[in-house]
Amino acid sequence: MKVCPECGAVYDGHHWVTEPDKELLRKLAKSKKEKELCPGCLRIERQQVEGVVTLKGAFIDSHLEEVENLVRRVAKNGWHQNVAARIFEIKREGDGLVIETTDEHLAERIGKEVEKAFKGDLEFKWQKKDRFVRVSWQRE
């Protein structure tokens, strides 16, 4: 069995689990544990960004905390489904936020959830060759 030293995810021999059940915890307690970075932590270490979400407009200034909380919640839910899907960085730029993710589908989900919660204009630009997406959302 393998355990990620950064986030605590457990590899059960088939896939990485972020919240091991009692049975897996029992197996983990009895077995020899190897330390290995999970796919998400490995992508962060390699600075492997597969999605960039740009949220712009006056709405961000007046609802910054709400928007950031939603983004973090979407990322946390995504992590439970896919251990490789993480937020690499959230930074404030001008009248908006830029969120870099380690998974293109997480970036897409963040954009869709922000648009669903706060309306606005949403656009996706997928790169054909690479696994990469630019998500733009704006609301004044």
Go through the PLM ranges and name each one:
Residues 31, 46, 92, 128-130:
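Short coil/turn motifs at beta-sheet boundaries
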Residues 27-28, 61, 91-94, 134-138:
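Short amphipathic alpha-helical patches
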Residues 15, 19, 61-63, 98, ...:
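Residues in flexible loops and secondary-structure boundaries
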Residues 3, 10, 72-79, 84, ...:
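Long C-terminal interaction/binding lobes of large macromolecular proteins
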Residues 17-20, 51-54, 112:
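A generic "cationic amphipathic patch" detector
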Residues 44-106:
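Extended interfacial segments that mediate partner engagement and assembly in macromolecular machines
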Residues 1-46:
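N-terminal cysteine/histidine-rich coordination modules
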